[in-house]
């Protein structure tokens, strides 16, 4: 498996990396839920410019995700 890279990711692509056994829509839901349920993560994402309708995650946002969830 290729080493995970911190880069801009389409939201759905990163969601599927974290939830590879889920269908696309389910992976999106679980990923969003995880952001809300992980203490401090939602606030950190918003501080990096994340909004509910964000389609592409920036490198800074991906760093926050990895900080809270680890690499996919």
Language model features with spans:
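Major-groove DNA-recognition helix of helix-turn-helix-type DNA-binding domains
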Residues: 21-56
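A near-ubiquitous, low-amplitude feature marking generic local secondary-structure context
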Residues: 1, 14, 45-48
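A short, Lys/Arg-enriched interface patch at domain edges and termini
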Residues: 55-72
């Amino acid at each position: 498996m290729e080493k995970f890279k911190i880069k801009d990711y389409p939201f759905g692509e990163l969601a599927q990396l974290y939830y590879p056994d889920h269908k696309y829509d389910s992976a999106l839901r679980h990923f969003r839920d995880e952001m809300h349920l992980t203490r401090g993560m939602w606030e950190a994402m918003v501080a990096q410019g994340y909004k509910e309708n964000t389609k592409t995650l920036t490198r800074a946002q991906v760093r926050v995700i990895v900080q809270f969830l680890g690499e996919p």
